[in-house]
A protein has these predicted regions:
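Hydrophobic transmembrane alpha-helices and their helix-loop junctions in integral membrane proteins
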Residues: 1-207, 211, 215-219
């Protein structure tokens, strides 16, 4: 799925490059539109993340949402903040996807959050590193995502885009909601997996947990 999606995104980007760049690019005219489109993308993708029960789909929509923040940064002229968020996002999103892989590994391939629950007792390292990733992407102080998102939102406000700022702030709240919904459904509450899956539950090997810990530290 990832290879197909990446291929489509690249093809689209290259086609748009070839069609639009020869005609010129007026920053003064286009920048506000880019900011609005970025804010709308961030918000819409966050609402889609709330509706998902597949752990990988939740993270996929969260990626689209965070890309929306980066477009907001470009639209309001906060290029450094956009690159900063790109870097922080690289670490906590790698952490979250690897953590999701560890969960799926423990669950013998199951990806449905509604069939999980109570996993913190069986995969504690994965649990705590996923909590760190959720805090980082939610923009909770003092984790990495707070500083990069705060810079983007402040730039939107100070450059005279209050609506973009408000949508970005609302999106941050939605992000926190669906990420901790993911953590809650997977790791907390009652166990909802079948007996056979429960019998094989185990923490991932060091080849997976060590990178999780390193990425968690880089997300602080």
């Amino acid at each position: 799925d990832g290879n197909i999606t990446t291929g489509l995104l690249r093809a689209t980007a290259y086609v748009k490059d070839n069609r639009l760049l020869p005609r010129g690019f007026d920053k003064a005219t286009a920048a506000p539109d880019i900011a609005v489109i970025g804010a709308a993308t961030a918000f819409f993708a966050a609402t889609m993340g709330i509706a998902q029960t597949d752990i990988k789909k939740v993270l996929a929509y969260s990626t689209v949402s965070q890309l929306g923040y980066m477009f907001v940064a470009v639209g309001v002229g906060a290029f450094t903040a956009g690159i900063f968020h790109l870097m922080t996002h690289a670490f906590f999103k790698a952490l979250l996807f690897l953590g999701a892989g560890s969960v799926i590994h423990a669950m013998s391939g199951e990806q449905d959050l509604l069939r999980m629950g109570g996993l913190r007792r069986y995969i504690p390292v994965t649990h705590w590193t996923m909590v760190v990733g959720a805090l980082a992407i939610s923009g909770i102080f003092p984790f990495a995502g707070f500083f990069s998102k705060d810079e983007i939102l402040w730039s939107a406000w100070s450059s005279g885009h209050p609506l973009v700022w408000a949508v970005g702030l609302a999106t941050a709240g939605l992000t926190a909601f669906y990420m901790f919904r993911l953590v809650s459904l997977a790791f907390w509450g009652s166990e909802r997996m079948d007996h056979e899956t429960k019998r094989h539950l185990h923490e991932s090997p060091p080849s997976m947990t060590v990178p999780l810990v390193i990425l968690a530290l880089l997300s602080l």
